[in-house]
């Protein structure tokens, strides 16, 4: 499993238009006998699974300090109130994870925060960008291995062609 797959496996969920719906109490009149229940969002099972996986991801990756998502975003110059407008091309993978966690945690204080980010495509955009970090990683590893092999071959190869030419010229000069 790739590093961010626990989150990015949900991309297909966000490509649909079925995320959940608002529950609005229309049966009760607000009297003491029939108090009105505050509106809330009933998310689909797929969105509930995503929310659970976000929490699981935070627990599994303590090195990212995502429990302090606010601090992680501040370190990257991202104002949590402007998170949806953040330029994701300039944000690293940990910053993207912090944006996702912030959005999920916002639901506790603002019903419908996740639904809004589903409908406007914000979560889909963040998850697609996060997936690009997983896709880029194998290429980065290949490049690093090539560079490492070049370094080791030049440092271990004392009989390289330029080295041999230099040695031959020293012999012919009598040095």
Predicted segments — roles?
Residues 1-59:
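Short terminal alpha-helical segments
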Residues 19-24, 63, 88, 105-117:
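Charged, low-complexity interaction regions
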Residues 23-41, 69-88:
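Extended non-catalytic scaffold regions that mediate assembly and binding
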Residues 43, 47-72, 76, 114:
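Compact disulfide-stabilized, cysteine-rich extracellular microdomains and processed peptide cores
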Residues 46, 65, 90-95, 122, ...:
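Structural recognition of alpha-solenoid helical scaffolds
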Residues 87-105:
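Short amphipathic alpha-helical heptad-repeat segments
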Residues 146-148, 155, 161-175:
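Non-Sec secretion/translocation targeting segments of pathogen effectors
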């Amino acid at each position: 499993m790739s590093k961010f797959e626990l989150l990015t496996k949900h991309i297909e969920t966000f490509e649909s238009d079925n995320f959940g719906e608002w529950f609005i109490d229309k049966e009760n009149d607000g009297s003491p006998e029939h108090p009105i229940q505050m509106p809330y969002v009933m998310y689909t099972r797929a969105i509930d699974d995503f929310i659970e996986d976000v929490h699981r991801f935070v627990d599994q990756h303590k090195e990212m300090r995502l429990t302090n998502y606010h601090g992680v975003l501040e370190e990257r110059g991202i104002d949590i109130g402007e998170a949806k407008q953040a330029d994701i091309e300039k944000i690293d993978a940990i910053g993207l994870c912090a944006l996702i966690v912030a959005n999920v945690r916002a639901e506790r204080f603002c019903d419908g925060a996740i639904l809004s980010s589903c409908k406007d495509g914000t979560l889909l955009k963040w998850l697609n960008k996060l997936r690009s970090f997983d896709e880029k990683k194998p290429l980065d590893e290949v490049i690093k291995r090539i560079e490492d092999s070049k370094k080791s071959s030049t440092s271990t190869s004392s009989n390289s062609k330029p080295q041999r030419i230099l040695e031959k010229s020293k012999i012919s000069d009598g040095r």
